[in-house]
Amino acid sequence: MANQMLAEVQKALQDNTPQAEDRLALPDVLVTTAACLGIAIVAAVPGWIYLSGSFALYLALIIGLMFFGIYVARRSPVSAPLALVYSAALGLMMGAFSHMAVGQGGNVALITQAIIGTFAGVIGMLAVYSTSWGKKASRANKLFAGLAIGYLVLGLANIVAVLFGVGGGWGFYGVSGIGLVLCALGVALAAWSLLIDIGRADQAIQGGAPRSWSWSLGMSLASSIVWLYMELLRFLSIANR
């Protein structure tokens, strides 16, 4: 999604340079990111209540989100309604996952720790991006895409492992020895995804992209933040079993 979106932004700039009042600004990205995160958090409540008790519904939501994400990635730019609907679906999954994660460990305080860790991760990635190394890492899209696809395949295989009771209900993540390593890999990839999204937003703003791209960037940033939260929560839940 990141590579295609950045290419579309660059194409839009080449085809038609927007007027100054129609150019993307930092407040535009902040507002859309906050809106997408807010919708996701609100949607997490029914996800926590209604979806966590049925693994079949949760699995259906994951599959639906995958196809929804592919559809959204092909839209350029993403409209506000589409970004908010996608964020709501992501929030449902976040709520269901959160309930199941603390259910495994029985410690709701882990959610607070994961939220604090997510805030720290966002601040940390902003600090990393301010360095020359961080800017280079944010442009390593092809390497990230390859690793992300591999991690997605692992996630699909892990669903099968969960169905067979591997790792005490956590799949490969719950296997002693490699479980925490896989969790740490997930946290690292989510943080890298956030770094790439920060870089794309900065490039779009500096390049004078049209304001219509604010929802695409905000949705992408919010998705990476939610992903980072979920990976941190999984790491904490398994580490505290």
Label the predicted regions.
Residues M1-R241:
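A hydrophobic alpha-helical transmembrane-helix feature that marks the membrane cores
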